[in-house]
Amino acid sequence: MVPADATTWWALADNGYAWRTNSADFQLVLYRIDPRWGDPGGPTVQETVVLRDPDRRIPWTIVCDPPHGSRLPGLGFNALPPSPPACGDDPAARILTGFDLDPESFVRLPDGTFWVGEEFGPFLVHVAADGRVLEPPVGVPGVRSPQNPFLAISDRARAEAPTVAASRGFEGVAISPNGSTLYALLEGAVAGDDPQDLRIYVFDVARRSFADHYLTLRLELPSQQVNLASLMDASGAPVYPAAVAPPAGPVSIGELKAVNDRELLVIERDNHGDDLAAPRFKKIFLLDLPQAPEHGGRVGKTPLLDLLAVPDPDGVGGDGDFFRLPFYTIESVHMVDERTLLVA
C-alpha cells in the first residue's frame, strides 16, 4: 500500500486466483481505499483503476488480444468463451489479466504514475494514473523466470535457461524520496547465488535502466521454535492448539519500502499461519544502504519489529500485553511517521 492523499491509500491486487493458469479471467487492478480506521463499517473502495495496454506497449500476445489467444504456454484458450469476461466490451482496451502479468509490488511517482514490480518476467512495468501501460516492461539482463514470456516467443531467449524460480520475482519495490531511484528486490535467489542471499537491483528512473551493480540482502533462517504457550487469544486459549512449530525452513520477503535516502524497511516471514502451522517468524528489519556500494555487497540489517510480539501496553488488540499478527502472508509496510508503521 502507498498513500494517495491524507485519508486514502492505493492498494494493488495480486495476479488473481493464486495460479497463473486459473487467472486469465481476473482483471489486474489498483484500488484507492479509505481504511476508515475504527469505523465498524470497515474500509471502502473509493476508486478502481484497471490495468490495460491500449497502446500495445507489451510486446507479446495477451489474453485480451482477439481472438483471445496467447503464445504463452500453459493455458488452453479453447476453454475460454469467445469474449472472456475479463476483457470487457472494448477489445481495443486490451485489459491485462492475471495470466499476462503477476503484480506483487508498486510505487507511486511524484507525477502520479506507478511502477509495478511483477514476477513472470520478472519485469518493472510503468503505468499511468489511469491504468495504461506507458512503455515496454523492463527486465533485468540475465534474470528470467520459467514464466518469462520471451522464453515462449524468442528463439534466443528460449536457448537460455531460467535463472530464478517461478513466483520469485520482484516481490518488493521501493522508491527513493526524490523519486529518482527504484530498489527492486527478488523474492528468490538467482541461480548460482547462496539461497540465503537475495538481490536488490538499483533502477535509474530517468534512464529507464538498471545499474551495473546490485546489492544483497541476507535472509534470516531462524532455528528457534516459537513457544506455542505464548500464542494465546484474549481468553487464554492457544491460537494454534493443535499446531506444531515447524523446523527451520525457508523465509520469504513480503515488502520493501524506503524510509529515507539511506534506509529501507523489509518484511521477512516464514510460510506458516492461517491454520497451516504455527507461525514463528514474522519480522520487519531496517536496512542500511552502503554509501559506496560494491557489486553484490550486503546491506546492513537491524531488527525493528517482531510481528508476533508487538508491544500493546494499552490492550488495543485485545490479546494482552502483546499483539500478534500470525498471518501466512504479510505483504505491506509503510512508515506513516517517525513513530508509526502501517502493516498489512
Please place each PLM-identified region on the residue numbering.
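Sequence/structural signature of beta-propeller domains
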Residues: 1-344
